[in-house]
UniProtKB/Swiss-Prot annotation:
GO biological process: cellular response to glucose starvation; fatty acid biosynthetic process; positive regulation of gluconeogenesis; regulation of carbon utilization; regulation of glycolytic process
Protein name, entry field: 5'-AMP-activated protein kinase subunit gamma
PANTHER family tied to this protein: AMP-ACTIVATED PROTEIN KINASE, GAMMA REGULATORY SUBUNIT, LD22662P
Biased composition (Low complexity): 58-88, 165-226
Region (Disordered): 45-226
Gene3D superfamilies xref list: CBS-domain
Species whose genome carries this gene: Dictyostelium discoideum (Social amoeba)
Domain annotation CBS: ranges: 279-341, 364-426, 438-499, 517-574
One Pfam family linked to the record: CBS
SMART domains the record matches: CBS (SM00116)
């Protein structure tokens, strides 16, 4: 079993901060509810209730939606509510048996947050009221050992841990925004009932859109069928062999090639001797989305949880049916850019559910979930990643619970290999990547700072690449990298019009950095860097790729973890051959 390192400790710290903030917000809401009930009571009744204190108690409950073989208990502070009266009045039961009648809410209640505060377990987002459906409709959840089901306005959160969880982060009043990150406020301005909103009695705060922050935005019209010009997209044409000849990097001799073969065989034997179960951390989180969820809600769920993909659960088939990734959302954005139904792409995305939207766009998708099992050795699991050209491979416990235990990645496999190897093949790891011929050098695609964002999105979709370097048109030096992970940052906006996608890509990323502290994306290496140093840098920075540059910071190539893993598991591919 591999024990998690700094990455899990950092995530735990983030979750603890969220829990503290949510606990404070719940206390504030409870006090406001108590004050509201006092204002509705007659004076004599208020005195009889003992100052109008509402009863709060610890209640050990077993959720009715939990599988019959599972018993999960949680301690929660609750206030008894009864909404069955004919006048739509809210009736609160007090500790002395009195009923407090409150007028019906005139303000629409916000949807719950997508994120559960629990760190450990499987989080399933399952919509029961995406289209305003009410009632006691039972949801079929993915089978787990222990399921904790929290019923809220629009969806269920199913968490396999028995830890108490709060998930009303998004339902707090913005009067308390002085102690809250303003970026966690209103996500969408759509009037739909399933829209996540934040309400206030005085004013409504909306995160500014890209167009409102642009000083040079002249694309105010709705560009339905804009012709996409690729004139600002270029390709690095000089191959690695020519670059090595110019810089004096030596070719691999027969003795070095022997060390390479021996080192690669050591790595292969190590991976064949360990299973996926060995890589699964002690604690972790897997987010699962129901196929009935609205596309917009799925988009928000990925951003809220800081992930790039999630398995899809079909409640009718009682099985996992695939993955939804940021690549899918790129195709969705491009679809609504060309065929907008309104001036807000996010509003358009709320129309379709995940299960029906793929019929609207002609995108090739796997017919079933590509997965592996805990008993599969890491060599076979890595081969699946490389064969299907995917970045994430779910590890499914098909024998017992049919639940997803972990999402395996190139980074996780390489990190486990580097940390757990008893004796690393240092001779192989000390060879420069330029000599090994790892990476893409002859066909590196780059864009300019003024390239429209929509052209970059089309490039990522057409070329099936995960990132593209951004080059300054004056200096020809790299200034940034646009990756697929940047796509989810768009969900932080309240409105995204089709014309916003016409903005220059560098301007968009600068806005993201100013508003939402977008993490640094430029991680580089050179052809002279050793293979071991490159692997360590990717793992430490938690990035999938490095941009290979020369001494003047001009792009020469791209080196990804997929390239490294493919090189280690296959025949020698030096530039001599």
């Amino acid at each position: 079993m591999w024990y998690p390192g700094d990455e899990d400790e950092e995530f735990t710290s983030i979750i603890e901060n969220i829990e503290k903030k949510e606990t404070q917000e719940i206390k504030i809401k409870t006090e406001k509810l108590r004050q509201a009930s006092l204002n509705q009571l007659p004076i004599e009744q208020s005195e009889g209730v003992g100052g109008g204190e509402l009863s709060e108690y610890n209640n050990n409950t077993t959720n009715n939606n939990t599988p019959t073989n599972t018993t999960t208990t949680t301690n929660t502070n609750t206030t008894t509510m009864n909404n069955s009266n004919n006048n739509n009045e809210r009736i609160l039961s007090t500790s002395n048996g009195f009923d407090i009648r409150l007028p019906p809410n005139s303000i629409e209640q916000p949807s719950p947050s997508f994120i559960s505060s629990s760190q450990d377990g499987v989080l399933t987002v399952d919509p029961l009221a995406v289209d305003g459906e009410k009632g006691n409709k039972e949801s079929q959840s993915p089978p787990n050992g222990d399921n904790q089901i929290l019923n809220n306005n629009n969806m269920f959160f199913k968490d396999i841990t028995s830890l108490p969880s709060t998930d009303n982060k998004s339902s707090t009043n913005t009067n308390n925004n002085n102690n809250e990150n303003p970026l966690k406020q209103t996500i969408s301005s759509s009037p739909s009932k399933s829209t996540t909103t934040t309400t206030t009695s005085t004013s409504t705060t909306t995160t500014p859109s890209l167009s409102s922050l642009s000083s040079n935005n002249n694309n105010n019209s709705n560009s339905n069928n804009n012709y996409i010009n690729h004139s600002s997209i270029s390709t690095v044409s000089e191959g690695l062999e020519n670059l090595n000849l110019k810089s004096g990097i030596k070719k691999i001799d027969s003795e070095t090639e022997k060390y390479i073969e021996e080192g690669k065989q050591v790595f292969v034997n190590f991976l064949k001797g360990h299973t996926c179960y060995d890589v699964i951390p002690i604690s972790g989180k897997v987010v699962v989305l129901d196929t009935k969820l609205a596309v917009k809600s799925a988009f928000y769920a990925l951003e809220e949880n800081g992930i790039k993909s999630a398995p899809l659960w079909n409640s009718e088939q009682h099985d996992f049916t695939g993955m939804i990734t940021v690549s899918d959302f790129i195709d969705i954005l491009l679809y609504y850019y060309k065929k907008p139904k309104s001036n807000n792409i996010f509003q358009d995305m709320g129309i379709h559910r995940i299960e029906t939207f793929w019929r609207e766009i002609s995108v090739e998708r796997p017919s079933s979930l590509i997965s592996t099992e805990p008993e599969t050795n890491l060599y076979d699991a890595a081969s699946l990643l490389l064969c299907y050209k995917i970045h994430r491979l779910p590890v499914v416990d098909k024998k017992d619970t049919n639940s997803i235990l972990h999402i395996l990645t190139h980074s996780r496999i390489l990190a486990f290999m580097m940390k757990s190897f008893p004796q690393l093949p240092e001779k192989l790891l000390s060879i420069p990547i330029g000599s090994l011929g790892i990476g893409t050098f002859a066909t590196v695609v780059t864009v300019m700072t003024h390239t429209p964002l929509v052209e970059v999105l089309e490039l990522l979709s057409e070329k099936k690449i995960s990132a593209v370097p951004i080059i300054d048109s004056e200096t020809s030096k790299i200034v940034d990298v646009y990756s697929k992970s940047d796509v989810t940052l768009m969900s932080k906006q309240g409105i995204l019009s089709p014309s916003d996608l016409n903005l220059p890509v560098h301007q968009v990323l600068s806005t993201f950095t100013k508003l939402w502290q977008r993490p640094e994306q430029i991680y580089t290496c050179t052809r002279f860097d050793k293979l071991g140093d490159v692997i360590e840098r990717c793992i430490k920075k938690r990035v999938h790729r490095l941009v290979c540059i020369d001494s003047s910071k001009k792009v020469e190539g791209i080196l990804s973890l997929s390239d490294i893993l493919n090189y280690l598991l296959n025949d020698v591919k030096s530039i001599n051959h």
